[in-house]
Amino acid sequence: MKKEEMILVVDTETAMINPTAKVSGCNSLVYDIGLAVANRKGEIAEKRNLVVNDIMFGEYKRMETCYYAEKLPQYYVEMGTGVRQIVSLETARRIVLELMEKYNIKKVAAYNMMFDYYALKKTNEFLGGKFEFFPEDTKYIDILKMARGVFKNNKRYSNYCYENNLLTENGNPSISAENVYRYITNNPDFVESHTGLKDVEIETEIMAYLNNRKCKLNRKIAFNY
């Protein structure tokens, strides 16, 4: 019997290196990593909630100006109670490699995968690391690209966005993770947590929903950087 394929879903929260520059993975330092090992149905086998101490505490000036700085008190409380595991970036990488080996994972997924990939890469470089965060042969799945493929010209989704004012600055239907999750759960009042683990859980649900809509995790979606 063929063993079920497992995927590592990742979400990062970041502080900007240069607060006045454009938001991008290459201008970001990762302080929070959410990890979920899941199958194509979105069933989670294992999850981790990691805080990168080198950035959270070592770059406190930048942390004060991060996009979701108002959530920092929540982090401090949860770190104190053990809900969040405080680690170095190198230890976070070791945990990722152990999970990938344990579940024979070859694919890593994220909503806007390029941002998370380059944010982790830039954080590693910033801290003087010489390693690649993920194994060299890893395939990457961008859940955002999957969502665009399913919802871009979907009249029902567009109508839902217009009815609930879930629009971009240009007035087009938004395909953010928050708004896609609002649609698939029919909960227009849902507010994304913008913390690593909580966000990775909803992104796993979105991935499963899209996969059920025949948006296959094929070579057009899974790619190398």
Q: Which residues are covered by each model-predicted region?
A:
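Short, glycine/acidic-enriched loop or turn micro-motifs at the edges of active sites
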Residues: 12-16, 145, 202
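Short, surface-exposed recognition loops or helix-turn segments adjacent to catalytic cores
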Residues: 134-141, 146, 192-200
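Substrate-recognition/cap helix-loop segment adjacent to the acidic, metal-dependent catalytic center
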Residues: 114-139
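Conserved protein kinase catalytic core
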Residues: 17-19, 148, 205
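Acidic, Mg2+-coordinating catalytic module of metal-dependent nucleases/exonucleases
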Residues: 107-114, 118-119, 159-225
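Short alpha-helix plus adjacent loop in nuclease-associated cores
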Residues: 140-168
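Short, polar/flexible loop-turn hinges at active-site or ligand-entry regions and domain interfaces
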Residues: 79-83, 129-134, 187-192
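Conserved non-catalytic scaffold segment of RNase H-like nuclease domains
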Residues: 2-123
